[in-house]
Structure formats: C-alpha cells, structure tokens
C-alpha cells in the first residue's frame, strides 16, 4: 500500500505544470525511498527525471515497490480541484486500478476525495551511468527563464557558450540577432559556495609541494549523482545492449511522430522514513534568487539547443529560485532544479551541424 501526504498540493501542481508538455503518460515509481518519475519525450530529444524524497512528505508509507501509471493531463485536471494550501494525500492499494487523492482544507472542514484511473504503461529499467561535465553554471532561475523566453521570440535555437569571459546565450532570427552575456561575480561564489556540492564538475587544482615553489596540477573528478544520465548527442534515442538510453540529436528528434511511450525510472530500495517531519513546500532553500552567476569550468564549452525545450524546462522556476546548467561538448545539457522535497532534472540533446 502507498500513502503519501504533502503539506501543500501546490508542489504537485507545479511539478505537473513543468513536465506535462514534455510527457503524456508516465509511471510514478514508488518505493520506500520516495516517488520517482523518469521519462523521455516522444521525440527522444529530452529526458525528465523527478525525485520526491520520502522525508519531504508529512507522512509517507510504501510497503513495496509499485508503479503508478498515469496520464499527466488527467492528473493535472484532478490537481486543479485542490487549493494550493490544501493538504494532499495520495493513496493506492497493492494491484489497485485507481489512484486516490484526498484534499483537506486548512481553513474549513472541507474534505474532497477523487479516484483517478491508473494505466498499464510498458516501462524498462534504465541503466544510469555516472557523468562528468566540463562546465557548470549556477544562476537565478528567474534570470534563466527571462533569457530563454526573450530569445524564443527571435529564433528557434540558442547557442550556450561557457568561457572565462562568462556564459553567453546567443540566438539568430530572421528579424534580429540577440546575445546575452552573464559574468561571474565574487558575491555569487559566496552565495552558491555550498550549493550542489555533490554535483561538482571535473576541474584542476594546484597543489604546492612542501619545501618547493613547484606546483603540480592534479585533476579532480567528483562522482556525479546517480540520476545524471549520459546520452549520446549524435544519434540514437533507444536502449543500447546494456540497457542504457541515449538521446537523439535535437534536429533528428523533432522530425519524428509523437508516438513513443515514455519510460520509467530505475527503482531503488532504501530504508523507510515513515514519521519523519516533512520539509516545507517552498523554492530552493540552498541559495537565494538574487545570487548572481557562478561559473565552474574545466574547458571552453559551446553547444546549440532548441529554445522550445528550454522554455518548457524553465517552468520549473516555480519550484526553485536557483537553476544549474551542466555542460560538456557533444553531451546533452543537464538543467537541474532543487527544492525542499527533492529535485527535477532535464537532459536535452544538442543540435548537430549548427555553430
């Protein structure tokens, strides 16, 4: 049996608003550790991974791993019936064919209950390899949203370039060209110092030998989180022999019909966390919204992406004040938002043949 209670329904509403344009049907994988969703869009150009930790719920119980196949548009409609500050409880029995949602009002004795039909969705277990990136940009999510929305008015693609100068977003359109440069500030380094320490890029640090002025450079590689997915930016979009997914290039994927079914996230098993206090529903508690821009890089990176997808990703700014862009040449872009109850990550294959 599954029972998950959230302090506010607003969290689920914002999550669904962030991903419903990318994924139509998906499995929510529930286990003792929490609730996860992982699926690719129909063109196999983008992948979305959502993690809701068990400790982020006011109450959480999951007796055994179970997938909940839902149509995201239908779930969005059911969630619209709840007020943002309603206490939301999700229930499902073993082998159930319905998902029960209970909304409890904080200001009155009103209790609303909805039963939503579940779907049988074919899913595969994904192999998720560790990935290292050459550059990481940490910035206010509101700034990222503004940039991609502004540039989408002029063109269909954006070139994101990370260099010693800063991070540049450039787009070319029929009527006009645009370029936005964000430089790193010292204030940002301090404010983002502890943000995403487990997600560091590979870099170099100088180690001075004792008794000598000679410096030896050594490469520092920090293991990525298990959710980071390594995808080939050239061709593919299907499982390889080891069960790992590779994204198709943005150019190729946009030409396909939207008839692919999304895939679920790999299940994990961990100790139950029932009864632990829930984290409040709010934006990122790790960094302020006006933190400026922090850039960590090992080498120059320049890639081109579809603005249509980035605009969709930016809807997650409602969940977090801060966004991280992780990049390496010829590797899909990772856009990560962290919030009190977990995180949401997007992977987008770069366009091929564009400067």
Q: PLM features: what roles do these ranges have?
A:
Residues 1-20, 25-152, 159-355:
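DNA polymerase sliding clamps and clamp-related checkpoint/processivity subunits
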């Amino acid at each position: 049996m599954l029972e998950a209670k959230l302090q506010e329904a607003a969290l689920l509403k914002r999550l669904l608003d962030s991903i419903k344009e990318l994924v139509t049907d998906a499995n929510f994988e529930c286990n003792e550790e929490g609730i996860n969703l992982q699926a690719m869009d129909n063109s196999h150009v983008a992948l979305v991974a959502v993690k809701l930790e068990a400790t982020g719920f006011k109450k959480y119980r999951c007796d055994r791993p179970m997938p909940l196949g839902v149509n995201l548009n239908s779930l969005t409609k059911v969630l619209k019936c709840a007020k943002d500050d309603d206490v939301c409880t999700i229930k499902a029995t073993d082998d159930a064919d319905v998902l029960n949602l209970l909304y409890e009002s904080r200001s009155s004795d009103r209790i609303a209950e909805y039963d939503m039909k579940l779907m049988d969705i074919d899913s595969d277990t994904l192999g998720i390899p560790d990935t290292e990136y050459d550059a990481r940009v940490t910035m206010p999510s509101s700034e990222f949203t503004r940039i991609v929305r502004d540039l989408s008015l002029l063109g269909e693609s954006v070139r994101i370039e990370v260099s010693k100068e800063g991070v540049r977003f450039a787009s070319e359109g029929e009527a006009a060209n645009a370029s936005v440069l964000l430089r790193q500030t010292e204030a940002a380094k301090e404010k983002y110092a502890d943000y995403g320490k487990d997600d560091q890029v590979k870099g170099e640090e100088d180690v001075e030998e004792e008794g000598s002025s000679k410096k030896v450079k050594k490469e520092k590689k920090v293991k990525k989180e298990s959710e980071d997915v390594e995808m080939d930016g050239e061709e593919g979009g299907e499982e390889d022999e080891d069960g790992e997914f590779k994204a198709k290039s943005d150019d190729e994927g946009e030409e396909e019909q939207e008839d692919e079914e999304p895939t679920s996230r790999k299940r994990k098993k961990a100790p139950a966390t029932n009864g632990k206090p829930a984290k409040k529903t709010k934006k990122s508690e790790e960094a302020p919204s006006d933190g400026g821009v922090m850039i960590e890089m090992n080498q120059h990176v320049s890639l081109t992406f579809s603005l249509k997808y980035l605009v969709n990703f930016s809807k997650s700014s409602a969940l977090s004040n801060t966004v991280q862009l992780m990049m390496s040449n010829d590797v899909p872009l990772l856009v990560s938002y962290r919030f009190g109850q977990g995180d949401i990550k997007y992977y987008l294959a770069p366009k091929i043949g564009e400067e």
